Amino acid sequence: MFTGIIEELGTVREAEEGRLIINAAKVLWGTNLGDSIAVNGVDLTCTYLEEDGFHASVMPETYRRTNLGELRPGDVVNLERAMTLAQRIGGHLVRGVIEHTGTLESFTPEGDAIIARYQAPPEILRYVVVKGPITIDGVSLTVIDKTSDSFAVSLVEFTQEHTNLTRKRPGDRVNLESDIIARYVGQLLEERPAGK
């Protein structure tokens, strides 16, 4: 589990079929082989540690569900270590299991903030609630608007500076994870027998 609060921006050193090598520093502190690190919101297992980075294996299913297959050397990625029971949850509970990708539609300045609008599939939008949480490329954000095919979030200055979200361009794909509580409640209600 993660919190959606990005600890560090890493840089892709190598992106090969089935493996990523990422330059990083902060997320290496206290990290051991086999530990989880979220890369753009995707829970990956650390398979090899170096002084200035780590290796992670990527399964074919992960490539199908996420934007990790589009990464190239030099790309900047959001990184977060798995949470511990002793830390604050500054964002919301994030599994690191990407359900679908969405597409950046637009950025609109609003004071010091930027309103980011994303196109998303119905499978995600059914669990998106205005004022509820959503995870975009691993970043915990609050939904401020929703339409039949998109939603919007506000990126404050800190988020603009400490994540890779404003480095994206319209048309770029992002990893989406809906709120785990909304998803579980929704699925339980869908599976409930009719009339009960």
Question: Where do the model's predicted regions map?
Answer:
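Conserved loop->alpha-helix
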Residues: 1-196
